[in-house]
């Protein structure tokens, strides 16, 4: 059976891995998943990630913990295949009053809501991380 929403699957694997105190989680790789991991790493939500494999690329995400507690409190999908959510630059949400980040897919690539606001761009709200 094919996967209906690969990004929601990615977020679920990360959430489940952290709740189970796993060191890392693996998943099928794609350009969008790698771009999301770059944002998560830059914001300090994951330790590292690595994509490997030619025939079936695999993405391994190394999870991050602070004093034994998971760093990611909530990670949720906003825009989904059945209901895409697009926002203009002025309408970009602030997650938890600016403490979390919204991951936004813009014409210049995947970035945080802060970076998109500074660049004066809107886009599709992929998800929230806090």
Curated annotation (Swiss-Prot):
Keywords on record: Ribonucleoprotein, Ribosomal protein, RNA-binding, rRNA-binding
SS bonds (residue pairs): none
Any one GO MF annotation of this record: structural constituent of ribosome
Pfam family name, one: Ribosomal_S8
InterPro entries in UniProt: Ribosomal_uS8 (IPR000630), Ribosomal_uS8_CS (IPR047863), Ribosomal_uS8_sf (IPR035987)
SUPFAM superfamilies membership: Ribosomal protein S8 (SSF56047)
A single cellular component GO annotation: ribonucleoprotein complex
One annotated GO biological process: translation
Functional summary from the UniProt entry: One of the primary rRNA binding proteins, it binds directly to 16S rRNA central domain where it helps coordinate assembly of the platform of the 30S subunit.
Family: Belongs to the universal ribosomal protein uS8 family.
Subunit structure: Part of the 30S ribosomal subunit. Contacts proteins S5 and S12.
Protein name (Swiss-Prot/TrEMBL): Small ribosomal subunit protein uS8
Naturally occurring in which organism (per UniProt): Alteromonas mediterranea (strain DSM 17117 / CIP 110805 / LMG 28347 / Deep ecotype)
Phylogenetic placement of the source organism: Bacteria, Pseudomonadati, Pseudomonadota, Gammaproteobacteria, Alteromonadales
């Amino acid at each position: 059976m094919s996967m209906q929403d690969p990004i929601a699957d990615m977020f679920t694997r990360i959430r489940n891995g952290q709740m189970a105190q796993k060191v890392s989680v693996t998943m099928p790789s794609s350009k969008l998943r790698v771009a999301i991991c770059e944002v998560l790493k830059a914001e300090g939500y994951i330790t590292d990630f690595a994509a490997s494999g030619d025939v079936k690329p695999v993405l391994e995400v190394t999870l991050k913990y602070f004093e034994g507690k998971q760093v990611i409190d909530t990670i949720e999908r906003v825009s989904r295949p059945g209901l895409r959510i697009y926002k203009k630059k002025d309408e970009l949400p602030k997650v938890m009053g600016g403490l979390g980040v919204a991951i936004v897919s813009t014409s210049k690539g995947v970035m945080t809501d802060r970076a998109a606001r500074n660049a004066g761009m809107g886009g599709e709200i992929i998800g929230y991380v806090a």
